[in-house]
Amino acid sequence: MKHDPHLLDDYIKHILAAIERIQRYCADANELAFLENDMLQDAVIRNFEVIGEASKNIDHKFPNFLKQHPSLPLIDAYEMRNALAHGYFKVDLEILWKTINNHLPDLQEQLKNLRN
């Protein structure tokens, strides 16, 4: 089945928009503030779910794209989405905070470079 290549760019835009929202939500927070703010956590988790769902769609609909860009951690993003969506109250918020600060900027840069 052939898929519309414009959809690939749409999925990438969804991921980038979710990353930007997470960064905006957390811009004025340090780790302690994040760990104490359940509304912020919920907003961030929701956007990680968006990232994971778009990543899954890229993997399923455009498998050659991931083969061409093996350094993109989109499978990891989908697995994280599953852990968040099905972990309920077992989410490790410290890992989530580290992911926000240590991994999202790299993913954002990689995807922006692919779009240029």
PLM regions and their residue ranges:
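Solvent-exposed interaction patches of small proteins and small membrane subunits
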Residues: 1-116
